[in-house]
Amino acid sequence: NSAILDYQVITNERMPNIMIYLSSFKLSDRKVNNPNIYPYNVFRGKYIEPFVFTPITVFYGSNGSGKSTLLNIIANCLQLKGKEYATSNSYGIVDYCGSFSNECSYGLGEDDFGKEIRNIPSNSRYIKSEDILYEIKKIQQKQVLSDGMEYDCVKNGMSLSEAKKYLDSKEGKRQEEYIKFAQEKYSNGETSLQYYEEYLQPDALYLLDEPEVSLSPANQVLLADEINKLARLLQCQFIIATHSPFMLGTLNAKIYNLDTNEYDT
């Protein structure tokens, strides 16, 4: 853990054109009687001060440290696309997850004129590793490409006859070749990286949960480089849960170690 503590915080002076949308976040400090109630039990016994965010902030920790839970709580508080709603018990009688989220607090950043931002950008989102795996699985499980394209056309408002006519057209054939090319890219192990490249757009806050999943070490470094560029030049902010040494060694980030009781940086 000592190596993690040696990472330096990148200051605003070294990162021109940066944007901080979420400046701080404080977890609920309410004590509940039952030590097993989720998500209170995840952070029980921790000395919790507000997390203070930089353009790139990393939650580092082993499995069970609470890094994914923390990201999801932030996503719920901010109502980000991709947030997951969890229940605390098998009966759902008491909404402990909702209560916990309501007891959290956060601060927003400032705009170029020094005024507090009123809203998180609407294109911000919470991207989980299972989201990526689901997209890959969709590509793998299309049994017949033309059937999949026909289904997509009908789903987008075409009649069945219009869909068939479109797929027989020159444009439809071109689209089919494009999708085949995309599937071939997956066979080379690049679809995961391509997914991130398509979804990570300028001027947004992104919460990434274990983005290293399904990426080779080389592609993890490429993704980390892209994140650095988006944060430095294109006014993106990232909060990332990871334990990948390749990403930790490449990201220009402030790192919180969630394996300690005091959440060291």
Please name every model-derived segment:
Residues 16-48:
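N-terminal pre-Walker A segment at the start of P-loop NTPase domains
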Residues 7, 41, 56-78, 193-265:
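Switch/communication elements of ASCE P-loop NTPase nucleotide-binding domains
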Residues 69-151:
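ABC ATPase nucleotide-binding domain signature region
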